[in-house]
Amino acid sequence: MARKKIREYDSKRLVKEHFKRLSGQELPIRSVQINQETDLNELVEREPWLSSEKLVVKPDMLFGKRGKSGLVALNLDFADVATFVKERLGKEVEMSGCKGPITTFIVEPFVPHNEEFYLNIVSDRLGCSISFSECGGIDIEENWDKVKTITIPTGASLTFEICAPLVATLPLEIKGELEDFIQVIFTLFEDLDFTFLEMNPFTLVDGKPYPLDMRGELDDTAAFKNFKKWGDIEFPMPFGRVMSSTESFIHGLDEKTSASLKFTVLNPKGRIWTMVAGGGASVIYADTVGDLGYASELGNYAEYSGAPKEDEVLQYARVVIDCATANPDGKSRALVIGGGIANFTDVAATFNGIIRALKEKEAKLKAARMHIFVRRGGPNYQKGLAKMRSLGDEIGVPIEVYGPEATMTGICKEAIQYITAAA
């Protein structure tokens, strides 16, 4: 399971669309998104309610506590909304220690209300927990003792008997309505492969539940079976995180291939860099460097898998090596080319792309005092490792090569020993 945050706009879009599909009832949610590309005149023509109703506007940037931070404006007309957005669009703010520009806003009808409820559903490996409170809103944390929680084991259904403790203290006139609402939202949560869904608050309009503020996360590994249900979904970068040009390039490669190519710069000045085959293995290598006390020296996270073509590996390896060798400072560096034991991927074939990139970057590798550590197993691995061994002599760069007889992460310790001994 990979939990990916989505914007509030998309959370509400999914809930609105699929609440009706699953229950036959309409949730009167209306919202629009505004960013740098939005033509406000066209937006009003497409959504005429924007010019006839009082509105709410707030950033839609994956961070919370917007109300307490003065970033929510209420009871505005559209001209005021446009001014609010213009004054803040692209401006940098700091939230919970993270700084970044505000690029996206959500605009909705202003709904006067007296009641504020809280609903939260979270999934984990054992099932789901559902939390509910009659005291929702911005002070939910101060009223956490009033939150009731139930647990639904994996594979179990949410029956009215199980749900009963959540709504036990509600007035009779709204108890049934909210119980039905929680039932449908939980069904929707599972049907769409949400991993997290929070409404804080939701209220009642004409006796019917109406979500005012919403946060959602989806299991993006379920995208293959939900592409029609999710529609044009966006998984934004976390607030404060902006892709570098190199990361954007690899992301573009990844989008165009059936293989997997991932690359994230963690510390541009780090002295340990990785290029690891396999999603699970890549995490293990990164964790091992951290567990050995050298997380601060880890330059990147990198993973390739799914039998990428040689040219794709070549382009990928060029980027990793360019970042790993940038701005040589006389200190030694290590490049870990690791992986587990492949089942189907031809190790020699994927190594061909890496070897070509290493040859191209010979001068950069030497200038950065790079030492390369290789560990791999799988189909045709002997041929691939032999090529790596001969490459070291050919380009004059030290390369330590190991097969499946060595522990998978042993080269992490060797890399650390190298950079510390040479310090």
From Swiss-Prot:
Recorded GO CC terms: ATP-dependent citrate lyase complex; cytosol
GO biological process, one term: acetyl-CoA biosynthetic process
Major subcellular location class: cytoplasm
Highest taxon listed in the record's lineage: Eukaryota
GO terms, molecular function: ATP binding; ATP citrate synthase activity
EC primary class: transferase
Catalytic reactions of this protein: oxaloacetate + acetyl-CoA + ADP + phosphate = citrate + ATP + CoA
Pfam family, one: Citrate_bind
Functional description taken from the UniProt entry: ATP citrate-lyase is the primary enzyme responsible for the synthesis of cytosolic acetyl-CoA, used for the elongation of fatty acids and biosynthesis of isoprenoids, flavonoids and malonated derivatives. May supply substrate to the cytosolic acetyl-CoA carboxylase, which generates the malonyl-CoA used for the synthesis of a multitude of compounds, including very long chain fatty acids and flavonoids. Required for normal growth and development and elongation of C18 fatty acids to C20 to C24 fatty acids in seeds.
UniProt record similarity statement: Belongs to the succinate/malate CoA ligase beta subunit family.
Record's protein name: ATP-citrate synthase alpha chain protein 2
